[in-house]
């Protein structure tokens, strides 16, 4: 994998930094694992904008990813590593011994031809998945479930990982990249290793249009709006907004805690670093 800075042959190329992976599959994705993906433009069923800065972008197919890794005891082989437009990580097409194919997240160092397996008896190696109760303390893992059988929810993006730092009774304690320490049931599954494509963070899109290709619309500052649109709007001439920074709905934006799920507070051992 190489990081390439483009030559400034045009204003749009001047600041582009690409991450090039020559090992990615160059053909079409596996058709049986594709699903339709319709765009909402950030609107809900009544037509109102519920998510700002969303709209347009290239048409995409959704890749059906196996986040549960529940084919226990059946050996599989990585057929190829593919690009996925729906996430920062790359994905791997794996072929199981019974003939079934599935997409999984491609772990760091995973390549075509690698053997992988899920379940309690699996070898401790990158790409293999098993419950946290069988994973050695100190291991680096990704694609971690929060509820047994629900599918991976933690550490799924490019370069992500968590570390298993303790196991006590029915819960394992994980240290997340953010610094948060969290308890997860030991029956939840995790996959050894880090998520691949960690160089994703080094890329630079170089121009606004590249964001538009990805379905991201512009962000307008509150002080540039009218009073009807934002608490910072209005005023004669250029203003500072006149108050501490808030969202369009008046919620403070600088360090204000908005977490309200008290039911799961007991699982957080330490809040994330600021």
UniProtKB/Swiss-Prot annotation:
PANTHER family: LARGE RIBOSOMAL SUBUNIT PROTEIN UL2M, RIBOSOMAL PROTEIN L2. Part of the 50S ribosomal subunit. Forms a bridge to the 30S subunit in the 70S ribosome. NCBIfam families: rplB_bact. It comes from Shewanella denitrificans (strain OS217 / ATCC BAA-1090 / DSM 15013). Signal peptide: none annotated. GO terms for molecular function: rRNA binding; structural constituent of ribosome; transferase activity. SUPFAM superfamilies: Nucleic acid-binding proteins (SSF50249), Translation proteins SH3-like domain (SSF50104). The keyword rRNA-binding applies. Pfam families: Ribosomal_L2 (PF00181), Ribosomal_L2_C (PF03947). Residues 223-264 are annotated as: Disordered. It comes from the Bacteria. Belongs to the universal ribosomal protein uL2 family. One of the primary rRNA binding proteins. Required for association of the 30S and 50S subunits to form the 70S ribosome, for tRNA binding and peptide bond formation. It has been suggested to have peptidyltransferase activity; this is somewhat controversial. Makes several contacts with the 16S rRNA in the 70S ribosome. GO terms for biological process: cytoplasmic translation. One of its GO terms (cellular component) is large ribosomal subunit. Keywords: Ribonucleoprotein, Ribosomal protein, RNA-binding, rRNA-binding. Disulfide bonds: none annotated. InterPro entries: NA-bd_OB-fold, Rib_uL2_dom2, Ribosomal_uL2, Ribosomal_uL2_bac/org-type, Ribosomal_uL2_C, Ribosomal_uL2_CS, Ribosomal_uL2_dom3, Ribosomal_uL2_RNA-bd_dom. This is Large ribosomal subunit protein uL2.
């Amino acid at each position: 994998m190489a990081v390439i800075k483009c030559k400034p042959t045009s204003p749009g190329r001047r600041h582009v930094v690409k991450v090039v992976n020559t090992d990615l599959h160059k053909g079409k994705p596996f058709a049986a694992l594709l699903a339709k993906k319709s765009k909402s433009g950030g609107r809900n069923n009544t037509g109102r904008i519920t998510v700002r800065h969303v709209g347009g972008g290239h048409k995409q197919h959704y890749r059906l990813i196996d986040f549960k890794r529940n084919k226990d005891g059946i050996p599989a082989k990585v057929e190829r590593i593919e690009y996925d437009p729906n996430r920062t990580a790359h994905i791997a097409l794996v072929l199981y011994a019974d003939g079934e194919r599935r997409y999984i997240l491609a772990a760091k160092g995973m390549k075509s031809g690698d053997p992988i397996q899920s379940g309690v008896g699996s070898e401790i190696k990158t790409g293999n998945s098993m419950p946290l109760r069988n994973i050695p303390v100190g291991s680096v893992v990704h694609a971690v479930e929060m509820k047994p059988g629900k599918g991976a929810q933690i550490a799924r993006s490019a370069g992500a990982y968590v570390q298993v730092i303790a196991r006590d009774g029915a819960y394992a304690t994980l240290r997340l990249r953010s610094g948060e320490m969290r308890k997860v049931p030991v029956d939840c599954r995790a996959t050894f290793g880090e998520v691949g494509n960690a160089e994703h963070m080094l890329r630079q899109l170089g121009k606004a249009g590249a964001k538009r290709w990805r379905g991201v619309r512009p962000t307008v500052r509150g002080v540039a709006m009218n009073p009807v649109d934002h608490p910072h709007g209005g005023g004669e001439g250029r203003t500072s907004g006149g108050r501490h920074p808030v969202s369009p709905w008046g919620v403070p934006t600088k360090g204000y805690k908005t977490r309200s799920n008290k039911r799961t507070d007991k699982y957080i051992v330490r809040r994330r670093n600021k």
